[in-house]
Amino acid sequence: NGRCCHPACAKYFSCGR
């Protein structure tokens, strides 16, 4: 849970995980 591909989200979630 946490599909984000931008820096603001990637710092908490991995892009594509």
UniProtKB/Swiss-Prot annotation:
It comes from Conus monachus (Cone snail). Its main location: secreted. InterPro entries: Conotoxin_a-typ_CS (IPR018072). The modification Cysteine amide is found at C15. Expressed by the venom duct. It is found in: Secreted. This is Alpha-conotoxin-like Mn1.4. One of its GO terms (molecular function) is acetylcholine receptor inhibitor activity. The keyword Mitochondrion does not apply. The cysteine framework is I (CC-C-C). Alpha3/5 pattern. PROSITE patterns: ALPHA_CONOTOXIN (PS60014). One of its GO terms (cellular component) is host cell postsynaptic membrane. Disulfide bonds join C4-C9, C5-C15.
